[in-house]
């Protein structure tokens, strides 16, 4: 199963694409040098398969590469980061 995480700035969201289909999204809006993530969602047919984890890993990798931070308002996104001390430096 091939997957990629892509930023879609026109729709203000990150997308996890698996085999050509968007299966998970993280909505965001820009704030200074950070993104605010109020919502993460996975297609019901793909829940329970770690898709949102893959999405968040890609989002954080992109933020790290672009020297930006995150404000995780979504409980899932917040828990994902809190459970990974190595990612907490990305918190705004």
Question: Across the structure, where does each feature detected by a protein language model lie?
Answer:
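Conserved N-terminal entry element of GNAT/NAT acetyltransferase domains
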Residues: 1-6
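Structural motif
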Residues: 8-10, 31
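Conserved beta-hairpin
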Residues: 13-23
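Conserved beta-strand in the GNAT
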Residues: 21-29, 36
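A short, internal acetyl-CoA/4′-phosphopantetheine-binding micro-motif in the GNAT/acyltransferase core
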Residues: 40-47
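Conserved acetyl-CoA-binding loop-helix of GNAT-fold acetyltransferases
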Residues: 48-61
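Conserved GNAT acetyl-CoA-binding A-motif
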Residues: 62-75
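Short, hinge-like loop/turn segments at secondary-structure boundaries
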Residues: 88-91
